[in-house]
Amino acid sequence: DVPETVLDKYPFQLSGGMAQRVTIALAACSRARLLIADEPTNGLDEAGRAQFFALLDSIFPDAAKLIITHDISVAARCDRVLVLCGGRMLETGTVDAVLGTPHHPYTKALLAAQVANGMQPSPVLREGVSGCPFYARCSESDEACLNGAMQKHTDGKIEWWCCHA
């Protein structure tokens, strides 16, 4: 598609790649210093993801970028990572530290999950209850995890919130 033909289309009529390009063009008009992108590479193949990040870096070389993703390969392209479960922070640090030596059982489970082995269903997250949102599926959970407050831990490179260390 050339730009003139894109103007006459509704968003649902654009391919995933073209929709991403239009979104980037709109953001480029704002000269943003902070970009927040929710699943920006969803539906793109590896080549499309690489093109997306190259384009993002060329248009916004000095902007801070917050990428929200479930794709570990996308998270691996970032400088830092924050792992959330049920809206709660479980682990944060540099990508190399968190992906290389995860501390929280949830992060370990995410990294161990392989699409080739089949994805497990998402856990039912308990709302309005204290304790770890990963309790029901955690191999290391105990009674303290069910109702206790998650404590912040650090090893100097990674921070994680867990009921046990």
Question: Where are the regions that the model predicts?
Answer:
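Conserved ABC ATPase signature
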Residues: 10-14, 18
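ABC ATPase nucleotide-binding domain signature region
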Residues: 19-22, 49
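P-loop NTP-binding/switch modules centered on Walker-like glycine-rich loops
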Residues: 43-118
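ABC-family P-loop ATPase nucleotide-binding domains
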Residues: 1-7
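A short, proline-enriched helix->beta-strand linker immediately N-terminal to the Walker B motif
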Residues: 29-33, 62
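Catalytic Walker B motif of ABC-type/P-loop ATPase nucleotide-binding domains
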Residues: 35-38
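Charged, flexible cofactor/metal-binding loops and thiol motifs
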Residues: 4, 94-165
